C-alpha cells in the first residue's frame, strides 16, 4: 500500500491510497460469484447465470460494495502510516479502478491543530472580588419583605413607598414611541424602576389627578434609540395604595421555610454567597479563558464548529419549545458560528493543557463539584445529585468542569493577576 498526502487549506488534508489492482479484482470476482449463485435472471437456471451476465447487470452495485470494503479494510492503516487522526470520518472524493496495475482512492478530512500553549506567565488577567456588606443583606431582606407586602388603597396624597396604579403616555417631539405607554401600570415610589425624575414627580400627588413630566432618558439607556432623548410623560393617577405593616417575626420567617428570623438571615446570607460565587466564578472563568484563547491563535476544525453550532441551535429550539414559544423564524444556525468556534477552541486548549500537565480527576473531586453545584438548586439539591448518580456517564460533564477549574488554577498560579472589587448589586443585577 502506498500513500500520498496533500495539505489543502487550513486543517484540510487529501490522502490518496494506492493498492494492487489484484486486490480489487479478487474482491469483485468473489462478490460476483456469490451473486451468480443467488440471482434470478430469465433464461437461466438459478445458480447457473454466467459471470459475464452478472457483471453486466450488477457490476455497478458490486463495484460500490467492493470500494466500501477496501476502504474499511485499509483506511485505518493508511492514516496510521501518515500519522494523522481525522476530526471526523474522511469523505471519499475520488476512486480509480480502471488501471491495469493499481486501484486507488482519495479521501479528504480535517485534522486537529498542533497546539503549543503560550507561557502562562505572560498573561495579564483581571479577576473580580465581591464583599457582601450588611447593607447588601438588609437590601436583600427588604426584597423578601416586598414580596409579601400587601397594599391598601388610600385617599391621601402619595408618599415614598406607596404603590400607584397609573396610565401613562410618553411623547418625543409630540410623537408616541414603542413601549412608551401603558394602562393600569403598577409602580412603587422609591424603587427606582423608572428613569430619573419619573417617580420623584409622582410624590405628593392626589388620586385621580393628572401629571405632566418633562424628563430626559439617560445617555446609557438600554434602548439606544431613546438614549439622551427629551421626553414628556402624560400620567393619570388611577389609585394610590399604602403598604400594610409587615412584621419581621417568626410568622414572616416561616413563609420562607425557616423557623425564625435568625435562621432566615443565616439561610439568606448563604444563598447570597452562593449566588455571588456562581456569578463571579462565571465572570472570572471567562476572563481567564478569553486571555488564554487570545494568546493561543490557531485554526479550528470547521467540522467541529458546525457540530457545536448545531448543538447550540438545538439547545435554543428546546428552550423556546419548553417556554411555549414558536421556533418559526428563529435565527439561522450560522448565527451561532462565533460562539461555536470559541467553545471548540477553548475545548482544544483545555485538552492540550490537561495532557501537557498530566491532569487527572478523582471521583472524590467530581462528587465535591456535584455537591457544590447542587447548592444552586435549593430544595431540589438532592434530586439533582441523584439524577447524576443514577447514570455514571452523566458525570462526564461534571468531570469537564473539574478539569476546567484545574486549568484555571494552573493559569492563575503563573499569570500576572490583578483584582477588581465590585459591589454586590453590580454582580447580581
Swiss-Prot record:
InterPro entries linked: PPIase_dom_sf, PPIase_FKBP_dom, Trig_fac, Trigger_fac_C, Trigger_fac_C_sf, Trigger_fac_ribosome-bd_bac, Trigger_fac_ribosome-bd_sf, Trigger_fact/SurA_dom_sf
Protein EC: 5.2.1.8
GO cellular component: cytoplasm
Disulfide bonds: none
Gene Ontology biological process terms in this record: 'de novo' cotranslational protein folding; cell division; chaperone-mediated protein folding; protein transport; protein unfolding
Catalytic reaction(s) noted: [protein]-peptidylproline (omega=180) = [protein]-peptidylproline (omega=0)
Major subcellular site: cytoplasm
UniProt KW keywords: Cell cycle, Cell division, Chaperone, Cytoplasm, Isomerase, Rotamase
One Pfam family matching this protein: Trigger_C
One MF annotation (Gene Ontology) recorded for this entry: peptidyl-prolyl cis-trans isomerase activity
Subcellular location: Cytoplasm
Domain comment quoted from the record: Consists of 3 domains; the N-terminus binds the ribosome, the middle domain has PPIase activity, while the C-terminus has intrinsic chaperone activity on its own.
Similarity section: Belongs to the FKBP-type PPIase family. Tig subfamily.
Function in brief: Involved in protein export. Acts as a chaperone by maintaining the newly synthesized protein in an open conformation. Functions as a peptidyl-prolyl cis-trans isomerase.
Protein name in UniProt: Trigger factor
Species name: Vesicomyosocius okutanii subsp. Calyptogena okutanii (strain HA)
Gene from which the chain derives: tig
Amino acid at each position: 500500500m502506498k500513500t500520498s498526502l496533500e495539505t489543502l487549506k487550513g486543517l484540510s488534508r487529501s490522502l490518496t491510497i494506492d493498492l494492487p489492482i489484484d486486490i480489487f479484482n479478487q474482491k469483485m470476482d468473489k462478490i460476483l460469484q456469490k451473486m451468480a449463485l443467488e440471482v434470478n435472471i430469465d433464461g437461466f437456471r438459478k445458480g447457473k447465470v454466467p459471470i459475464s451476465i452478472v457483471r453486466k447487470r450488477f457490476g455497478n452495485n458490486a463495484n460500490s460494495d467492493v470500494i466500501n470494503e477496501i476502504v474499511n479494510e485499509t483506511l485505518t492503516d493508511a492514516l496510521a502510516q501518515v500519522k494523522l487522526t481525522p476530526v471526523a470520518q474522511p469523505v471519499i472524493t475520488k476512486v480509480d479502478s480502471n488501471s491495469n496495475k493499481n486501484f486507488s482512492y482519495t479521501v479528504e478530512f480535517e485534522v486537529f491543530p498542533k497546539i503549543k500553549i503560550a507561557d502562562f506567565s505572560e498573561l495579564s488577567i483581571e479577576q473580580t472580588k465581591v464583599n457582601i456588606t450588611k447593607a447588601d443583606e438588609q437590601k436583600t431582606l427588604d426584597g423578601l419583605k416586598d414580596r409579601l407586602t400587601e397594599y391598601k388603597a388610600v385617599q391621601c396624597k402619595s408618599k415614598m413607598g406607596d404603590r400607584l396604579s397609573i396610565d401613562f403616555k410618553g411623547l418625543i417631539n409630540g410623537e408616541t414611541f414603542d413601549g412608551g405607554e401603558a394602562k393600569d401600570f403598577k409602580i412603587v415610589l422609591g424603587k427606582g424602576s423608572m428613569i430619573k425624575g419619573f417617580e420623584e414627580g409622582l410624590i405628593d400627588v392626589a388620586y385621580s389627578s393628572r401629571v405632566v413630566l418633562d424628563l430626559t432618558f439617560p445617555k446609557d439607556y438600554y434602548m439606544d434609540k431613546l438614549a439622551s432623548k427629551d421626553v414628556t410623560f402624560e400620567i393619570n393617577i388611577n389609585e394610590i395604595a399604602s403598604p400594610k405593616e409587615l412584621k419581621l417575626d417568626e410568622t414572616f420567617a416561616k413563609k420562607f421555610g425557616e423557623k425564625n428570623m435568625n435562621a432566615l438571615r443565616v439561610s439568606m446570607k448563604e444563598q447570597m454567597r452562593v449566588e455571588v460565587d456562581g456569578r463571579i466564578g462565571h465572570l472570572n472563568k471567562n476572563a481567564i479563558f478569553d486571555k488564554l484563547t487570545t494568546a493561543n491563535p490557531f485554526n479550528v476544525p470547521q467540522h467541529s464548529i458546525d457540530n457545536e453550532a448545531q448543538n447550540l441551535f438545538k439547545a435554543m429550539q428546546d428552550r423556546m419549545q419548553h417556554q411555549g414559544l414558536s421556533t418559526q423564524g428563529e435565527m439561522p444556525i450560522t448565527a451561532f458560528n462565533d460562539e461555536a468556534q470559541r467553545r471548540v477552541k477553548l475545548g482544544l486548549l483545555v485538552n492540550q493543557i490537561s495532557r501537557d500537565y498530566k491532569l487527572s480527576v478523582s471521583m472524590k473531586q467530581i462528587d465535591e463539584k456535584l455537591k457544590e453545584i447542587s447548592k444552586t438548586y435549593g430544595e431540589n439539591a438532592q434530586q439533582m445529585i441523584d439524577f447524576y448518580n443514577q447514570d455514571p456517564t452523566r458525570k462526564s460533564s461534571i468531570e469537564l468542569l473539574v478539569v476546567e477549574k484545574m486549568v484555571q488554577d494552573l493559569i492563575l498560579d503563573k499569570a500576572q493577576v490583578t483584582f477588581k472589587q465590585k459591589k454586590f448589586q453590580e454582580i447580581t443585577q
